[in-house]
């Protein structure tokens, strides 16, 4: 049986390329006059998707029309399905077309203006093999469409713009490690589209002068360089220099220890990719965060009640998460966002420590009260993370805080920072026409009430409660990252480190932060009964290695800045002795417990990026 022939000219597109695209269709059957055609771009309407063309041929660029075999022009009609803002395009054939004749659907310059690529239609901003476009044909003209014919086009990376270097943040002297180098276009896609003579030179601090590494850009767009090692302890950054353009690309800092070191793992416990929908394609989502973003861990964070999220989908997500979890390579966790119906309880990201199951649904698909969820669980069955706590609409007032489950709190995500209010100096306030900040939900407000938790950061979320933020004037910031310091690169070790609050948050940059009081790490609880010397002196020490020049390093005590360092560079080791008599430096416990003080570190880079260490608490006993 003869099939219709569908092809696109040009057959390959570069991500973001502006051009005129001809979708050539040679019908296998006779098409009478009045045949109805429907052309579907197959997009979701995201900013990164294929550009939606106009049907108005009086404008010079980005139009859509049909050209018959006799070169007659047929205008398109944009048709919107109920509830959709993404059109399909319909054409009515003005003449009959014989079997084997070819007509074209054209996206690009209007036929009434000069045909220039610069005034064409924009390709999507991400790579894709065999991107489909659908053409439905109804010879009766009544809209009775059957299965479509499919056009496909390969989307490849555009011109080389950026080189990213992914390396472990902690390494040991003379112990070998691997790094991954990604060659990317301006949209973050892998590419090898660069002049053939392009060479990349690799270097780093203390590299012997007689050693020279020269790299060529591989066809795959990435390369893994094995068996690197450092001869001396210290802070290193790997540099790649494009010999053609003289551009220099630098890795995030790498801390080299003398003998042994823990693992510093980077990832997301709450977040979604703008590029890949986690519910629609969890496997692609996990691959994206593992391979493209080089995260060490990722947790799913679907809302418990969400359109299209069926029990079968949840089961599939949990199974894929289990399959992707691989020690020493990638930690995948099952979680869900729980929205309480009780005022002031807000949003929780619930991480399932044991076998994944839906934490809150029962037969009627309603949520258990938060207290009931905690009552039927033990502290090592789940970790509950209050998020977006300073939100006026969806925040948490910490009145019903459960320390055994809520071991960490989200201090930052792409929709704002909950550390403090804008009036108190917050550079990332929750701000916009949809939502604003609530002082009762700030992190500092809770810490001053002797609630104890570590800090994590969330990424971008455009689902459920956040769905209206994306297309509004709600202020949006860079997606954050969570750093976890653990003994092993494994799921159990990561969860134990979270439970011990040995973690910190950043606004998305891999800033290395160390914060100690009398050698006790972040997340610790100290007591003057065990360490009487704390009554006289709290010796605070650590180091920071930034991804850019560090502007300030603030030691925060009880919500106020105790001391500020002003480093002149990207690396800084610090020491500070808090000699205030401890009885004068404490806060009263609202529940009549021992007076206490809390300390944490706030880091700000010159480029505006920030990091927050988890606190350390000291009790006056």
From Swiss-Prot:
Belongs to the chlamydial CPn_0512/CT_425/TC_0708 family. It comes from Chlamydia muridarum (strain MoPn / Nigg). It comes from the Bacteria. The lineage of its organism: Bacteria, Pseudomonadati, Chlamydiota, Chlamydiia, Chlamydiales. This is Uncharacterized protein TC_0708.
């Amino acid at each position: 049986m003869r099939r219709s022939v569908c092809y696109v000219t040009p057959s390959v597109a570069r991500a973001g390329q502006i051009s005129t695209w001809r979708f050539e269709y040679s019908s296998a059957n006779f098409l009478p006059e009045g045949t109805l055609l429907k052309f579907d771009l197959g997009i979701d309407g995201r900013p990164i998707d294929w550009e939606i063309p106009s049907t108005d041929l009086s404008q010079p660029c980005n139009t859509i029309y049909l050209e018959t075999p006799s070169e007659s022009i047929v205008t398109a009609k944009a048709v919107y399905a109920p509830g959709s803002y993404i059109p399909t395009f319909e054409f009515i054939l003005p003449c009959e077309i014989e079997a084997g004749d070819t007509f074209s659907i054209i996206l690009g310059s209007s036929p009434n203006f000069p045909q220039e690529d610069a005034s064409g239609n924009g390709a999507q901003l991400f790579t894709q093999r065999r991107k489909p476009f659908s053409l439905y044909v109804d010879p009766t003209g009544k809209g009775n469409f059957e299965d479509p014919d499919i056009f496909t086009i390969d989307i490849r990376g555009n011109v080389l713009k950026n080189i990213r270097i992914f390396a472990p943040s902690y390494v040991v002297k003379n112990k070998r490690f691997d790094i991954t180098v990604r060659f990317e276009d301006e949209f973050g896609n892998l590419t090898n589209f660069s002049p053939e003579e392009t060479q990349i030179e690799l270097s780093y601090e203390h590299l012997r002068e007689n050693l020279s590494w020269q790299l060529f850009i591989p066809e795959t767009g990435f390369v893994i360089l094995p068996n690197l090692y450092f001869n001396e302890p210290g802070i290193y950054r790997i540099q790649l220099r494009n010999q053609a353009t003289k551009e220099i690309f630098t890795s995030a800092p790498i801390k080299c220890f003398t003998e042994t070191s823990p693992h510093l793992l980077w990832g997301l416990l709450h977040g979604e990719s703008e590029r890949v929908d986690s519910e629609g394609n969890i496997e692609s989502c996990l691959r994206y965060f593992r391979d493209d973003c080089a995260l060490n861990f990722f947790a799913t964070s679907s809302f418990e009640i969400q359109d299209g999220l069926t029990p079968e989908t949840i089961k599939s997500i949990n199974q894929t998460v289990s399959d992707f979890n691989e020690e020493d390579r990638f930690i995948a966790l099952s979680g869900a966002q729980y929205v309480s119906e009780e005022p002031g309880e807000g949003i929780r990201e619930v991480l399932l420590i044991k076998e994944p199951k839906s934490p809150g649904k029962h037969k009627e698909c309603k949520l258990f009260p938060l207290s009931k969820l905690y009552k039927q669980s033990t502290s090592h069955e789940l970790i509950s993370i209050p998020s977006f706590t300073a939100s006026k609409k969806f925040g948490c007032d910490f009145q019903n805080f459960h320390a055994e489950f809520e071991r960490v709190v989200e201090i930052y995500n792409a929709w704002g920072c909950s550390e403090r209010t804008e009036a108190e100096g917050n550079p990332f306030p929750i701000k916009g026409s949809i939502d604003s900040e609530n002082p009762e939900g700030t992190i500092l407000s809770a810490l001053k009430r002797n609630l104890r938790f570590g800090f994590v950061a969330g990424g971008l979320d455009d689902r459920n409660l956040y769905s209206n933020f994306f297309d509004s004037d709600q202020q949006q910031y860079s997606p954050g990252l969570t750093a976890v310091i653990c003994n092993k690169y494994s799921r159990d070790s990561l969860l134990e480190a979270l439970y011990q609050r040995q973690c910190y948050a950043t606004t998305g940059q891999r800033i290395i932060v160390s914060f100690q009081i009398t050698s006790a790490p972040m997340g610790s609880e100290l007591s003057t009964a065990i360490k009487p010397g704390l009554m006289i002196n709290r010796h605070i020490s650590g180091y920071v290695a930034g991804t850019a020049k560090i502007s300030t390093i603030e030691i925060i005590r009880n919500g106020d800045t105790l001391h500020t360092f002003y480093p002149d560079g990207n690396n800084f080791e610090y020491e500070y002795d808090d000699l205030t008599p401890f009885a004068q430096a404490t806060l009263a416990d609202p529940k009549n417990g021992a007076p206490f003080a809390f300390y944490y570190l706030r880091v700000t880079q010159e480029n505006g990026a920030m990091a927050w260490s988890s606190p350390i608490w000291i009790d006056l006993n």
